[in-house]
Amino acid sequence: LIDLLTRPAPAPAAPRRGYAPLPNMALALQTLVECTEAEEDQPRLGLLYGNSGFGKTVAAAFAAAQTGSVYIEAKSLWTVRALLEAKAEELGITKPERTAPRLLRQIIDELNRAPRPLIIDEMDHLVKKQMVEIIRDIHDATSIAILMIGEEALPSKLKEWERFDNRILVATPAQPATAEDALLLRDHYGLNGIIADDLAIYFAERCKGVTRRIVNNLRAAARTAATEGVDTIDRAWWGPRLVTNGDIPTRRSLGQ
C-alpha cells in the first residue's frame, strides 16, 4: 500500500494545441463556405444544429478562425440593444449609435464596407427573445453569409418565421462522436499512453456520442489510473466503474 501511494504516476504525453480534428468542425466550415459561395440571387443563411455536447461551439470557433468571420455567442438575457452592441464590438465599431435602429444601420454599413461572414452561436436564445427578424434585416441588407448554431429543435423553431425560414440555404445536423472520434480526443489530450483503445471506445458508446462527456470521462479515467498507480488502463481494468453520461446512477451502478 505504501509503495502504491508513493509510486509516481506515469507522465502523460503533452496535450496538443488547438482543436481535435473532429467531423463537426469540417461540417461547420463546409456549411459556412456553401453559404459564402452561394449565387448572387440565393440566400446565405446556414444552420448547424444538434444535441448539447456535440462540439458545435468548438466547430463554430474553428470555422470563424478559418474564415475571419465575426463570431458572437448569444446570451439568455440579451435585449435587442445587447445583441447589436455585441455585433458592433466584434466589428470594431468604437462609437456605436445611441438608438437601436441607427446602430443596426451602422452595423449594416460596416458589413457592406468590409464584408465578413457572421457566426451566431446559441441562436436558440435569439429565437426565444423574438430577435430573428434582426438577423434577417442584416442578411437582406448585406451580401454576407450567416451561420447560426443551435440545438436539435432549432430548424423547427425557425419555421415560425416563414420569411426567415425560406432564406435558409443549408441546414446541417451536427454528428455524434464516433469510436474513431473518441480515439482522436484521447490522443489530442495526450492520454494515448494511459487509456487503451477499447476503453476510449467504451466511453464513446456509453456517452452516446456526446463529445463533452467523452472528454470528461477520459480525463477522469486518467486521474483514476494515476491515483491507483497504474500505467495503462483498458476496458477490462475499468470493469463496473461508473461512466458519467448524464444518466441518474442506480443503487446497483453505485455498487450498493
Where do the PLM segments sit?
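Pre-Walker A adenine-sensing motif
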Residues: 25-40
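A short helix-turn-beta junction within AAA+ P-loop NTPase domains corresponding to the substrate/partner-engaging
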Residues: 68-69, 159-176
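C-terminal alpha-helical "lid" subdomain
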Residues: 1-27, 53, 57-61, 163, ...
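Conserved catalytic segments around the Walker B and adjacent sensor/switch elements
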Residues: 46, 64-76
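Walker A/P-loop nucleotide-binding motif
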Residues: 38-61
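Mid-core helix/loop region of P-loop NTP-binding domains shared across ATPases and GTPases
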Residues: 79-85, 94-141, 145, 157, ...
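Short, hinge-like loop/turn segments at secondary-structure boundaries
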Residues: 88-91, 114, 163-166
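Sensor-1/coupling segment of RecA-like P-loop NTPase cores
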Residues: 46-52, 138-162
